[in-house]
């Protein structure tokens, strides 16, 4: 992700439809969707890095700020650069509470892929299953972001080996959902894996995330990440 682009620069990029990506962030309530969105906004230069995680910029309604939950879906356009290529990413932050599931479905019908945010300690919860099922029913391919890794370190004080086991269990449980709800032709194709980079883990509150591709590029191990 790179810094803020002017409207003219964005318009130039989106003149090529192949440079546009649309994705939504879906999750169980309080698993860190909006905090993760804050981190992406900060990395793009839209909000201050110091306010990421507390600004809850995608929760613009007073009721959302007061209750600490997302009630209506909100969208933002971000710039992303990979190598020499520029992309425009339209991100939708969706509600996590079961009462607002209808708004999640509407968002899923406007996107290419979904990021399922899951608390590393709580794992797959009821609404995690619900929004993942919705994504699969709308033929929107999900990837997995395991959030709140800091809780495994600071609260549970797990060893790196035990943490890897915990993360593997979350991935396995998530793939069980895909096996249960995906159409037959996608059951194996859409399963996520740490090894292929479709699983990312991190701490949205602390504004970091990493997957196997990044670890290979930077030459770091899982233990290096934890020790840092």
Tell what function each PLM region has.
Residues 1-118, 124, 131, 156-159, ...:
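P-loop NTPase switch module centered on the Walker A-proximal segment
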Residues 1-29, 120, 124-228:
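P-loop NTPase catalytic nucleotide-binding module
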